[in-house]
């Protein structure tokens, strides 16, 4: 999209290919969340939890779905109307008004260390002090950030974005359009040891690969270990947050999401379209079927074979947890009732004793 300082609402609508309701000449020069937006901002409403702001916002325009535009049309405000998912159109506006910051190091920096056997594709950017190992392959239009390492025999597809200080060890295979945030480590050895008769632990070599398919995103300081014999696999479209630990020979299906500080132990298989909440712990050698949602801090100790929402430790269906929480909340009242019953029983006991001693 072309970039300039100010757009009319109609110009934005044409760029986004959406409809306008209201004053098409309204000037827009920035983006802001609905609660803070001023007259020169465009904002959006995606979650109805924030609908209370739509009446009071000073935004120059609001991006809404068709259903929302019908619901709030009486407010006499400027709307950009999309078929669904206002947040997607808003993201395009962000890209218009806040262009990405370039590093200032186009091409291959002279301090980068590239093995002579490595293959570097067309239009690749390699920033200062990055290291590309022997027989590594960097696909066209990919970007390797400052101080990052791509190990020997590793493969990166086209249009990958590897931020600074990423470690991609040897024999890692990464698909197209993969984004890896700073500090991530891909292909480290798994946590596998054998303990001898004297109680000493000896590390086992891990010879498998890590395979990252197309359109995967990996957060900052996340670690993905290679398998001992077989590969660790992250399937296409999966998004992984910061500080996630994925152990050896884990397989994660397509278009799943893993939130920060989750940990998945070795040889576990995760299905497609699974959501793993923050700080969730998943034990090893189990499987989780498709379309499972794990709430934050869930402790998964055995396989999950039915889609649905799970939580607690050990993990159990959300409805069961909800019932248990309701009972726990009722404990103070139950304690009060028990106390009252105890007092009544004591009173009855005293009266009974008095009746027995009365001649």
Swiss-Prot record:
Reaction(s) the record says it catalyses: a UDP-3-O-[(3R)-3-hydroxyacyl]-alpha-D-glucosamine + a (3R)-hydroxyacyl-[ACP] = a UDP-2-N,3-O-bis[(3R)-3-hydroxyacyl]-alpha-D-glucosamine + holo-[ACP] + H(+)
Q: Name one GO cellular component term.
A: membrane
Taxonomically, the superkingdom here is: Bacteria
Main EC class of this protein? transferase
Query: Active site located where?
Result: 248 (proton acceptor)
Identify the InterPro entries for this entry. Answer: Hexapep, LpxD, Trimer_LpxA-like_sf, UDP_GlcNAc_AcTrfase_non-rep
Q: In which pathway does it act?
A: Bacterial outer membrane biogenesis; LPS lipid A biosynthesis
Q: Which GO terms describe its molecular function?
A: N-acyltransferase activity
Q: What is its EC number?
A: 2.3.1.191
Pfam families, alphabetically? Hexapep (PF00132), LpxD (PF04613)
Task: Enumerate the UniProt keywords alphabetically.
Answer: Acyltransferase, Lipid A biosynthesis, Lipid biosynthesis, Lipid metabolism, Repeat, Transferase
Q: GO terms for biological process? A: lipid A biosynthetic process
Task: Return the PANTHER family for the record.
Answer: UDP-3-O-ACYLGLUCOSAMINE N-ACYLTRANSFERASE, UDP-3-O-ACYLGLUCOSAMINE N-ACYLTRANSFERASE 1, MITOCHONDRIAL-RELATED
Q: Which family does it belong to?
A: Belongs to the transferase hexapeptide repeat family. LpxD subfamily.
Q: What does this protein do?
A: Catalyzes the N-acylation of UDP-3-O-acylglucosamine using 3-hydroxyacyl-ACP as the acyl donor. Is involved in the biosynthesis of lipid A, a phosphorylated glycolipid that anchors the lipopolysaccharide to the outer membrane of the cell.
HAMAP family attached to this UniProt entry? LpxD
Q: How does it assemble?
A: Homotrimer.
Indicate what this protein is called per its UniProt record: UDP-3-O-acylglucosamine N-acyltransferase
Gene of this entry: lpxD
